[in-house]
Amino acid sequence: MLAIIGGSSLTKLPELEITERKIVRTPYGLTSSPILFGRLGRLDIVFLARHGFSHTIAPHEINYRANIWALHSLGVENIIAISSVVGINPDFENGSLVLPDDLIDYTYGRKDTFFEGQECPVIHTDFFNPYCDELRQELLNITKAHNVPIYDSAVYGCLQGPRRPTRAEIARYRRDGVDVLGMTGIPEAVLARELKIAYAHFCSVSSIDCFDSGVETEGCNEQTFMAMTKIRQLLNGL
């Protein structure tokens, strides 16, 4: 089964023909939102709103373990995670799409493993390649079939949030080789790997210029909306 996790710009999936809503209780508490079951294009999928349907949960307060555990308990084998990111690589244009192939973790204090040595033994999970190559290739094939341009290689930097970074921090991330910044890709990808769920991160890019003044402009919002519309159309073609 495929799960789609929607981010801040995709708290709902209008194209989903909903057949069931389910509240899932896990050993780690409740999920961010009830889980929706339904039909999207040719596939039966489940949908989870990472920040809640009304975007009320900050990145550092998301119950990532409950979200991933719940999807695993429902038989999910593949996750496509949708996010809006900020491009700090000048080559990444506002409104473009990107499929990261690596990441750097700048978060702290998040519950980022199921294996804490209590109920579950300590396991050192292989995370050398953080995203599933096969699932990424499927998404790349879909974008190619629809003639939608996409950056197929990028380093995703996951920030703690919810604040935005300083100029000095952005300069540091660039020196580290980061292309795009987000706040939710970790520990989501790690937890999925621990439960052997294939995981790919499908992102829409906003330019760092949109946030220089600390206020998003109307043009930036429009570009983000258009990029997310493209992602929804591509998902509908799965």
Identify the meaning behind each predicted range:
Residues C210-L238:
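His/Asp/Glu-rich mid-to-C-terminal helical/loop segments that flank catalytic regions of hydrolases
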Residues M1-F127:
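Metabolite-binding pocket within alpha/beta catalytic cores that recognizes anionic/polar moieties
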Residues F128-R174:
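Active-site rim beta-loop-alpha module in soluble metabolic enzymes
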Residues M183-G219:
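Zn-dependent metallopeptidase/amidohydrolase metal-coordination segment
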Residues H72-G75, D91, D176, V190-A198:
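Alpha-helix C-terminal capping segments
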Residues H55-H60, C158-Q160, G177-V178:
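Short, flexible loop segments at the rims of nucleotide/cofactor-binding pockets, characterized by
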Residues I68, I170, I186-A189:
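Generic hydrophobic/aromatic pocket-lining and core-packing "Φ" positions
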